[in-house]
Amino acid sequence: MRTSQAIFILIFLDSVRNQSPQVIPAKWDVVYEKETGHNMSLTVFRFQVKEQYSVARIIMSCNESTEHNPLLAVFREKLAILSLQVPLIVDNYEYSQVARTLCPFTEYKEGEAFTVEVTSSRPVHYNFRAELVQNFYLYNNSQRLVTASASEPVYLRYDIPGDVDSVAVHLDSNSTICMTVSVQKIGCPVFDLPDNVNSMGLHQTMTTSATIPVEKSRMSSFYVVFVVNTNDDLCSEILSIKPNKPTKFPLRMKSFNVTIESSMKIFDYTIPIVFWACILLLVTIVVFVYHYFDGIWERRFVSRAYTHLEDNAQEQRIRDFYDFQRMSEDDDLKDYDLLTDCQDMMVVRAKASLTVADLSMTPYEERELKYDVYKIALAIIGIFYNITVLQLIISKAGSLRQSGDLDECTFNFQCARPLWYFVAFNNVVSNGGYVYFGTLIIVMNYCRERSFRRLFAVQPTLAERYGLPQHSGLMTAIGLAVIMEGISSATYHVCPNNINYQFDTALMYVIGMLGKLKIWSLRHPDMVVSAYHAFGFLGVFLMAAIAGVYVHNMIFWALFSIIYIASMLLVSLEFYFKGIWTLNLRELRNSIRLSWVSSRHLSCVVPAYKARFFVILLLNIANTAVVVYGLEAHPKDFLSFLLIPFIGNLFIYIIYYILMKMIYREKIPKRAIALLFAAVISWTCAGILFNQRVSDWSKMPAISRELNKPCIFLNFYDNHDLWHLSSAFAIFFSFTAINVIDDDLMFVMRNTIRVF
């Protein structure tokens, strides 16, 4: 627009070349009230440049000029020709007062003239004033109050000191008027109009807060440009009604404070990173020391347990011998009708009181293969998933660096620590905890598996009749999922927005699903869900979750509610009846009729498994409440909305499992109690930090930046970074506790361990 406007003006000037212009020796800071001449005659204002590198600002106003008879002004400088038109019309918003800051007089010598040429097609009255900009330079940690309007953009200059690697340009305002802030390399012309301010450098929209991190390697000196937008469409989800034709509007003024602060040097990044690495190293030392002493305890324990098991086996053989002899003497086996299907699944699971032995009748090797499929399938999914994610995010990072449009990503810009291609390197590196603890879960699970194999080699009876069946596949899959969560979360934080939000959220769903399956498998080893069915269901679930991000009509919510409640009902039936129910309506009707006829005092209404019924009722009430809330509120952040019940159900299941152990008077190992206590503390801290949001991709970028907050730890980590760290600890403590919570049952007969 600027180039075409200048060409248009030059054509006008060429048409009046033969006319004698009116030349006015002008003075700075003087208001000239003039009228343009007839026949496109020129009025030339000549200003003496008193000082090199000084900066001029022109203010013009005219109430008589129109779209078809504009007041035109051309500023002739040595490096460029700039133009100005009154009224200024942008998207049919018309402003009769216009101001522009010109390029610094870098090539002028003292006494040379700077000219402003004014003309119009018909005579109009106008006011004109030229002034030298005072305090054109910005300085470190010095706050500057600036005022700009839609037709009066402002820009200031800043030079990064030699001992500074990067700076943060911070703005705050009490006004919510939408404005665009741009950081541009030193040059002429400066792009300071609403239609071209986004064409150069780094830029972002602003309501009450904005922060732009600038690296010295990218721009050692730059202009900070402030352009107030004609409306709030770029900052608000509610679009304004634009005029159909040019309409005069009053000036949209916005006052704000500008502060430039030095960011951390690259060398200073090592302190918070090394600090975090030392914490992880300390955890590693504690884990290995624990395993060392645990190995000593294991050898002593196995020695005592071996004698105990031999004594029990001898006593059992004696009891079996006398029982068989007594039966032989009293009756003949031929007198009894033998139940040939006593080992049938339907018969066993219909018992009033199930034991783990009833649900672990499948050969160990066959079960182990099913559990191993989880880690194999997840590893394959992870490879293809993360390759695609990495490819997309690398492309996105390059696009962000080229376009400079910081509205593409919802960072916490007040605590963004740039490095290499990362705008907020701290958000990326803080995800290392997931990768570390996921790896640690796998290593500890492998050591545990080896320990059990050594134990079972010494005493094979343990693997067949005692304790809970030990399968490592699911826990290894959980470790892989946590590693993938760290990688996906790191890639998401390269440029967080609504397009790639599902990168790490999808892995949170995987962790939640595997956690529930792990707890279920502890006492239901034969009822393992096929990995293909589990991941297939999760895939459909994720498709619905992604659809919910973009579709918000009532039809979608109605379908979602029906499917969600139906899924909860099916899971509830499976949990309550342990897989021996059917959807055959005739059998269901006959069963209800038989129960009603055979019951006394409505005893058929009383659930046979009260504890199961209670937890199912609690879960269904909680999940129904979530669905009702969704129908009422239609939350835009649908992925997080679904994640809450998904993880909440896991927590309720863990609490239920612990309470049932206490009800059946099963001891909880001290280490499991310690781990659970640490998990509760970690989850509490994580929950508090998560709710203290520092950005929100579901909101407009300018609105999201209103949530931005400074770093709160080591001048490097913000609330969300600490959420990453604390939730990584919480996940590790939680799943490690689940893995050892039943170690007290290692030498308890399997046919005496209750299923719940």
Curated annotation (Swiss-Prot):
Q: Where are the transmembrane segments?
A: 269-289, 374-394, 422-442, 474-494, 499-517, 531-551, 555-575, 613-633, 638-658, 672-692, 729-749
**Which InterPro entries has this protein been placed in?**
SID1_TM_fam (IPR025958)
Please name every pair of cysteines joined by a disulfide bond in this record.
Answer: none
Q: Name one GO biological process term.
A: cholesterol import
Q: Name one GO molecular function term.
A: RNA transmembrane transporter activity
Q: In the record, which residues are listed under signal peptide?
A: 1-18
Instruction: Summarize the record's disruption phenotype note.
Output: Hypersensitivity to cholesterol availability and decreased cholesterol uptake. When grown in low cholesterol conditions, 72% reduction in offspring number compared to 25% reduction in wild-type worms, 60% reduction in oocyte number, altered oocyte distribution in 47% of mutants, and 5-fold increase in embryonic lethality. In addition, in low cholesterol conditions, growth of mutants ceases by day 3, resulting in a 63% reduction in adult size at day 5, there is a 22% reduction in the number of L1 larvae that reach adulthood and a 4-5 hour delay in the L4-to-adult transition.
- Which reaction is the catalytic activity of this chain? cholesterol(in) = cholesterol(out)
- Any Gene Ontology CC annotation: lysosome
**Membrane side Extracellular: which residues?**
19-268, 395-421, 495-498, 552-554, 634-637, 693-728
List the subcellular locations. Cell membrane
Could you tell me which residue ranges are on the Cytoplasmic side of the membrane? 290-373, 443-473, 518-530, 576-612, 659-671, 750-756
**Membrane topology of the entry:** Multi-pass membrane protein
Taking the record's annotation, the residue ranges forming a coiled coil are none
Job of this protein = Cholesterol-binding protein which is involved in dietary cholesterol uptake from the environment. Does not play a role in double-stranded RNA transport in contrast to other SID1 family members.
- Family stated for the protein in its record: Belongs to the SID1 family.
Q: What is this protein called?
A: Cholesterol uptake protein 1
